């Protein structure tokens, strides 16, 4: 009789279980390795991007230093002079992150900024396969690798007056025979004896707004020899008789906007007006007879530099000699036969804090250029009414003021210069002639970035 011994399935089950665990373990290890690799890649990408924000912080640090100290006092605020003629600062931003910044004090200044961010851990590092990041206590016993990025930034000053008309908000050019063009009072090819000459005009009479609204710029039937610009998604409306373009387009009667003469990328800063340093002298109203005309105010300056004066109110007839800077704090009104007369060679810079100002009457009698008269509105100056029939030669910078133009002149020289305001509302006859010399000789904004180039972050010799 043959006895059958049953197989021992327990051993087979154990082997099968071990093999299964091994396969699952290998799969899990492969998955964890893949997850770790992806995590490290993601963390490195985030660190790489973060390093650029640290670089930007360094650039802002440098621009702020230049804003307050120019390029002649860069040793202020704990900046260190290093050879050859450079200024350096290191700024810690926490968690092992920091930036190093160097300024080269030339005109315009050049900035080098480097950003340093702790690198994420690699899979070979303790717990790196799972964490993918820097361990809190790693710095105590090992040097943490850093991700470094570095840029060279070129700068330049941006002029206040770059357009015939510039506004933060809406521009509405209603009226009759409204037009813009440009000339250059410092280039004899584009002026006659320094004055506007329609036979020598140019087509840079640009009109622009930061507004992003529909109908941000209503050109109406204006003849704009230049370009029109709005903020992102803003629109320009041109009436049936309106024309925007170069001289060939506008002067030949073409209607609408010439291709290439409209864009929607306008985004400029409007810095506040800063008063001159020092204590202003006082101004006394009275009756002053000069050349057979009685004046209410006589403002006498010096030839060397502006004399800083102050008055709570200004109006009537004003006579200006020399270079004068005048603060008008409460009331500014010129109507009827009122005027501001600039003697030959005189300059006047008005700092107007009056909430509502009127510049009408016979306007500003300025035999010089637009560089000789500036109206600067403080943040309390929220309205400026411009009218009368006198020609205006000068520049208006009132970034908080709603600019209302009523009436208009009786010839082609209504407004020579440039305007920068909050909004523009036009009614009447006005021709704007932008003096391009204002862009070169007029006031300048702070330095702005013009070029941004990423470099190898191991030396400062790219300056």
Regions found by a protein language model. Give the residues of each.
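Primarily marks folded extracellular/lumenal domains of secretory and cell-surface proteins
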Residues: 148, 154-463
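Beta-strand/loop motifs with alternating small/hydrophobic and polar/acidic residues, enriched
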Residues: 2-170, 444-463
């Amino acid at each position: 009789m043959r006895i059958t011994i049953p197989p021992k399935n327990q051993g087979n089950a154990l082997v099968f279980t071990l093999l299964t665990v091994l396969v699952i373990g290998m799969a899990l290890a492969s998955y964890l390795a893949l997850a770790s690799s992806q995590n490290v890649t993601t963390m490195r990408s985030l660190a790489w991007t973060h390093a650029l924000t640290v670089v930007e912080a360094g650039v802002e640090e440098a621009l702020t230093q230049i804003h307050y100290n120019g390029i002649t006092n860069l040793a202020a605020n704990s900046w260190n002079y290093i050879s050859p003629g450079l200024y350096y600062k290191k700024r810690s931003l926490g968690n092992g992150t920091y930036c190093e910044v160097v300024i080269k004090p030339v005109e315009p200044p050049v900035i080098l900024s480097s950003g340093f961010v702790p690198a994420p851990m690699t899979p070979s590092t303790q717990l790196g396969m799972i964490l993918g990041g820097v361990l809190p206590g790693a710095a105590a016993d090992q040097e943490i690798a850093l991700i470094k990025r570095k840029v060279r930034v070129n700068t330049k000053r941006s002029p206040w007056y770059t357009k015939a008309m510039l506004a933060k908000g809406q521009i509405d050019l209603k009226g009759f025979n409204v037009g813009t063009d440009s000339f250059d009072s410092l280039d004899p090819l584009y002026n006659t004896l320094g004055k506007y000459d329609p036979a020598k005009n140019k087509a840079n009479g640009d009109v622009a707004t930061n507004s992003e609204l529909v109908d941000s710029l209503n050109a109406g039937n204006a003849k704009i020899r230049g370009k029109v610009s709005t903020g992102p998604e803003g629109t320009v409306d041109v009436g049936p008789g309106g024309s925007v373009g170069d001289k060939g387009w506008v002067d030949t009667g073409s209607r609408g906007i010439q291709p290439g003469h409209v864009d929607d990328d306008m985004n400029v800063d409007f810095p506040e007006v800063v008063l001159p340093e020092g204590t202003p002298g006082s101004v006394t109203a009275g009756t002053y007879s000069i050349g057979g005309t009685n004046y209410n105010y006589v403002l006498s300056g010096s030839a060397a530099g502006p004399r800083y004066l102050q008055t709570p109110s200004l109006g009537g007839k004003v006579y200006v000699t020399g270079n004068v800077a005048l603060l008008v704090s409460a009331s500014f009104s010129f109507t009827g036969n009122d005027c501001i007369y600039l003697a030959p060679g005189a300059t006047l810079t008005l700092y107007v804090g009056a909430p509502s100002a009127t510049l009408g009457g016979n306007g500003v009698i300025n035999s010089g250029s637009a560089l000789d008269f500036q109206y600067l509105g403080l943040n309390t100056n929220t309205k400026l009414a411009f009218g009368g029939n006198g020609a205006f030669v000068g520049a208006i910078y009132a970034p908080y003021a709603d600019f209302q133009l009523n009436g208009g002149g009786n010839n082609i020289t209504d407004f020579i210069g440039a305007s920068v305001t909050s909004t523009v509302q036009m009614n009447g006859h006005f021709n704007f002639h932008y003096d391009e010399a204002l862009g070169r000789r007029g006031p300048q904004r702070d330095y702005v970035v013009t070029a941004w180039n990423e470099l190898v972050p191991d030396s400062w010799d790219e300056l």
